[in-house]
Structures are given as structure tokens and as C-alpha cells.
């Protein structure tokens, strides 16, 4: 997608700022993404010093229509994150790392789509659930939680007899 590319010719020495609006169609390019609906603003601040660019990428917004891990009801999750990357323009064919992105002089733009996607995905909460109320309790759909508990098969924990003897060992 061209809308997440920054033309190198547009970047002047000093600070340059670019704004990107991230919505649902952004995630269509990434087939293995659980995220399909979002309202996020990504800000790319590029500080150019000759052949070197310092990129500060910031995202702020919310991801919609995620499923709560507890009650499976749709929820929205706020997301805010920032990352810093160095972009070096070079003649050599070098492999980029997490901290440094190498761009050949023959290229005329920087595509930030993958970097924005990774920043969003890596900053999703590990456990996606409804927010806590004032008493610190989860505000999940109680009817759904009760149904899940009703139909959940409880399994007894069985131990492996080969390891049972180790339970009696006294370690000093």
C-alpha cells in the first residue's frame, strides 16, 4: 500500500512528521492477524541527519471487535506504544535488524506498513478481557461466564507414576 510509504525526496534535514490513519483495511494485507477493526493514529517522526534517519514511531487508538478471553464477548482495547529505529541509507546490501533498517540509495521511499503492524501486534495485551470495575472485579457478561462454566468438563489432574517417587525426596 502506497499510503504507508514516505518518499525519501520529501524528507528534509531536521525533523519531519507524518500521520497515518490505521483502520480495518490496513490489516487485510496481513493474513495471520486476529485484528480486523481498529481506529489508530500512527505518527512517524523522522529526524534526518545526512544519510541517517532517526525514526520515532508512535501509535495511539483502540482495537475493536476483539473477543474477551473470559466470556467471548466483543470488546475494544486501547493501545498506545512507541518505538525508535535508525534508518541508514547506503549503497551496500545490508540486512536490517530490529534497531537499524538499511535502505539502498536506489530506493525512493520507506514503507512503514510492516513496522506499524508489528508495533500494534506486539503491544496488544496478552490477556484480552473486559476492564475491571471500581472494586477490581472483571466486568464480563455473567450469563456467558455461567454458561461456559456449566458446559466446561472438569478434568482431574493425574500424575505420572514415574515421577511420583521424586515427590518424596527431601532437598537440602
Task: Describe each model-derived feature in a short phrase.
Residues 1-10, 89-172:
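Charge-rich, low-complexity linker and terminal segments
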Residues 68-71, 140:
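Short cysteine clusters
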Residues 84-88:
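Short beta-strand edge segments in extracellular beta-sheet folds
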Amino acid at each position: 500500500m502506497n499510503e504507508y510509504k514516505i518518499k525519501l525526496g520529501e524528507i528534509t534535514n531536521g525533523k519531519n512528521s507524518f500521520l497515518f490513519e490505521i483502520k480495518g483495511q490496513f490489516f487485510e494485507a496481513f493474513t495471520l492477524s486476529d485484528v480486523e477493526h481498529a481506529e489508530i493514529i500512527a505518527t512517524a517522526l523522522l529526524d534526518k541527519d545526512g544519510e541517517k534517519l532517526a525514526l520515532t514511531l508512535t501509535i495511539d487508538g483502540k482495537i475493536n471487535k476483539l473477543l474477551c478471553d473470559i466470556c467471548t464477548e466483543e470488546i475494544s482495547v486501547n493501545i498506545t506504544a512507541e518505538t525508535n529505529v535508525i534508518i541508514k541509507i547506503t549503497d551496500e546490501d545490508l540486512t536490517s535488524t530490529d534497531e537499524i533498517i538499511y535502505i539502498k540509495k536506489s530506493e525512493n521511499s520507506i514503507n512503514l506498513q510492516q513496522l506499524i503492524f508489528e508495533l500494534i501486534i506486539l503491544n496488544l495485551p496478552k490477556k484480552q478481557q473486559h476492564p475491571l470495575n471500581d472494586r477490581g472485579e472483571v466486568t464480563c457478561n455473567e450469563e456467558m461466564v455461567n454458561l461456559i462454566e456449566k458446559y466446561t468438563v472438569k478434568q482431574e489432574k493425574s500424575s505420572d507414576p514415574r515421577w511420583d517417587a521424586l515427590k518424596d525426596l527431601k532437598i537440602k
